[in-house]
């Protein structure tokens, strides 16, 4: 298939600049595969569309406040580092701006100078290996003090509270972007879901900035996905296998949870406790075998995410549903309304 097959026209005003308040006040489009119907609801009504015995699988990755504004030593020139992944110890792979002026040996100070960094080397793609020094026990304490959330480029409004870009169940630090389908859940909603006999399991997939990288190839099969680290615990693997054995549904919350489970299934032919890196790319023609339902947001035109949705729900039905979403003025992208394919 071609990239242009996944294009749709989206009015700019439908790109959400802030999350719903409260979180579960977001709208919910329910795509009923059995009856081939589109239903319009609100996210706090999600429990009504779940069944006793269902299992929701959420991604518990936590977003790092990984965007650091600093000054070069001794010139005082303003610069920016965006932490992408931990290489080893206090050395991280970073995106640097202005990259050409931050060569090996460049020293940077942040805040009151209690956090510093030295550029070690420049990688072939222009990213940098950077080693940090600080006066606290961990770097994460300094990131909480000086760092900002690395919001997607299409969100131009500053957040009032950085927790707005974290799920309420986030615990494993490591993502450069939020697993956004989970932003709709509140603790109260999760309690209601559990009270209906629905279980909730956790996986971890640390979302990389590659999630925003556009597909540049005309033929989507030629696209090379970025690599991301994931982990599935023994407890989660057991819950998934017990749910399937009992004939109940495994429902992925978000494309990251979906990609985690499908990666494990593709490698082992079943769900097992494991961790590793995945660059799985799911698009029409690839059968999803690990999930029975998917809760997700409304994604960018021509993105790998809308291609994944098309693989699960069907290309024609997906594009038709997106057309309806635009007509009904649903909100799109990271702070968007939600879709439940059941």
Predicted regions and their residues:
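Surface-exposed, charge/polar-rich loops and edge strands
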Residues: 1-342
């Amino acid at each position: 298939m071609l990239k242009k097959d996944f294009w749709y026209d989206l009015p700019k005003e439908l790109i959400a600049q802030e999350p719903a308040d409260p979180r579960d006040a977001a709208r919910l489009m329910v795509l009923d595969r059995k009856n081939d119907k589109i239903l319009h609801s609100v996210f706090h009504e999600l429990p009504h569309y779940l069944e006793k015995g269902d299992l929701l699988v959420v991604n518990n990755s936590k977003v790092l406040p990984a965007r650091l504004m600093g000054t070069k030593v001794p010139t005082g020139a303003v610069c920016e580092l965006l932490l992408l992944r931990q290489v080893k110890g206090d050395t991280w792979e970073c995106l640097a701006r202005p990259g050409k002026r931050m060569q090996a040996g460049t020293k940077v100070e942040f805040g009151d100078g209690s956090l510093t960094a030295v550029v070690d080397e420049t990688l072939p793609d222009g990213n940098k290996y950077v080693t940090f020094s600080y006066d606290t026990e961990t770097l994460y304490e300094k990131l909480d003090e000086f760092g900002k959330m690395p919001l997607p480029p299409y969100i131009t409004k500053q957040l009032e509270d950085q927790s707005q870009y974290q799920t309420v169940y986030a615990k494993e630090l490591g993502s450069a972007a939020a697993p956004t389908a989970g932003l709709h859940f509140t603790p109260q909603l999760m309690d209601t879901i559990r009270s209906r006999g629905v279980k909730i399991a956790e996986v971890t997939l640390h979302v990389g900035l590659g999630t925003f990288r556009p597909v540049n190839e005309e033929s989507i099969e030629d696209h090379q996905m970025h690599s991301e680290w994931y982990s599935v615990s023994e407890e989660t693997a057991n819950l998934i296998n017990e749910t399937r054995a009992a004939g109940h549904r495994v429902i992925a919350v978000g494309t990251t949870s979906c990609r985690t489970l499908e990666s494990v299934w593709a490698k082992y032919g079943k769900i097992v406790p494991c961790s590793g890196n995945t660059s799985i790319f799911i698009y029409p023609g690839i059968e999803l075998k690990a999930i029975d339902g998917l809760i997700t947001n409304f994604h960018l035109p021509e993105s790998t995410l809308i291609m994944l949705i098309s693989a699960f729900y069907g290309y024609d039905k997906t594009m038709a549903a997106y057309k309806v979403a635009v007509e009904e003025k649903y909100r799109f992208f990271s702070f968007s309304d939600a879709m439940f394919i059941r």
